[in-house]
Amino acid sequence: MDINEIKDIKTKELVQKYNFRFSKSLGQNFLIDDSVPRDIVNGADVCEDDLVIEIGPGVGTLTVQLLKRAKRVVAIELDSSLIPILTAELGDNPKFQLIHNDALKVDFNEIIGDEKSVKLVANLPYYVTTPIIVNLLKGGYNFKSLTIMIQKEVAERMNAEPNCKDYGALSILVQYYCNTKIVRKVPPSCFIPRPKVDSIVIRLERLEEPSVKVKNEKLFFEIVRHAFNMRRKTLWNATKNVKLPKELMEKAYEEAGIDPKRRGETLSLAEFGALSDAIDKYMNN
């Protein structure tokens, strides 16, 4: 199909045409500003060699722009009422594949197969943003990048530095696996229905190797989780659930050069890595 034959989708027109009813439980907000999908595609640097996986295509407003640039687009949609709309509007395009499923239950490796250049693009429902990001980053999938539209506050948490109120486990997770770049801000007026918060399009560029090298990744994230689950407590109290005798835990803190009276929110990524490696050493002695 000639890309010139791919017509832009007018969200409001399709919503009226199909008498679509928005689902509050699914957190649906569809784009109506034509500049946003184009900026997302440009920000994701989509090109003709790319397989693009889109989560939450809605009525296909962003999907159409992806189809103009990508080799292939696989869209994952949970809402059964959107399946016939997407099929009717985009089903004839040989570059388009639609999967009716929950993105949290999808095996992305089955979709990716042998593809070498895979990018994920998504307008994520706010209520599942963090679980989806955790799954995508820790799942070991071969994504070059994730370009996602999310709540402004979540984007700020991803980019947060130590000693900041937004700094937490999500900051560590994202910065461990990715470099981040803000593509653009998106005000509520760009959607129907209008959300009550501002949104941001952010690109997560997957690093070839994690930003910090750790011996035991599972333990590393366990320590991070303990530190931020009890963020007002000292590291010493927060890591009491780690199964290591007191005297060995003291040695681990000393070896890592970290005062156990500090709070988790003061530690850099590198310091969490050093503490994790020191604890791992004594756990395996």
UniProtKB/Swiss-Prot annotation:
Location in or out of the cell: Cytoplasm
Pfam families, per database record: RrnaAD
Superkingdom of the organism of origin: Bacteria
Keywords: Cytoplasm, Methyltransferase, RNA-binding, rRNA processing, S-adenosyl-L-methionine, Transferase
Ligand binding (S-adenosyl-L-methionine): 29, 31, 56, 77, 102, 123
GO molecular-function term, one example from the UniProt record: 16S rRNA (adenine(1518)-N(6)/adenine(1519)-N(6))-dimethyltransferase activity
InterPro entries assigned to the protein according to its UniProt record, in alphabetical order: KsgA/Erm, rRNA_Ade_diMease-like_C, rRNA_Ade_Mease_Trfase_CS, rRNA_Ade_methylase_Trfase_N, rRNA_adenine_dimethylase, SAM-dependent_MTases_sf
SMART domains (alphabetical): rADc
A GO CC term assigned to this protein in UniProt: cytosol
Keyword Endoplasmic reticulum (UniProt): no
Chief location category: cytoplasm
E.C. numbers: 2.1.1.182
Statement: the UniProt record of this protein carries the keyword Protein transport: no
Reactions catalysed according to its record: adenosine(1518)/adenosine(1519) in 16S rRNA + 4 S-adenosyl-L-methionine = N(6)-dimethyladenosine(1518)/N(6)-dimethyladenosine(1519) in 16S rRNA + 4 S-adenosyl-L-homocysteine + 4 H(+)
Function, as annotated: Specifically dimethylates two adjacent adenosines (A1518 and A1519) in the loop of a conserved hairpin near the 3'-end of 16S rRNA in the 30S particle. May play a critical role in biogenesis of 30S subunits.
Family from the record: Belongs to the class I-like SAM-binding methyltransferase superfamily. rRNA adenine N(6)-methyltransferase family. RsmA subfamily.
The protein's name: Ribosomal RNA small subunit methyltransferase A
Chain's gene name: rsmA
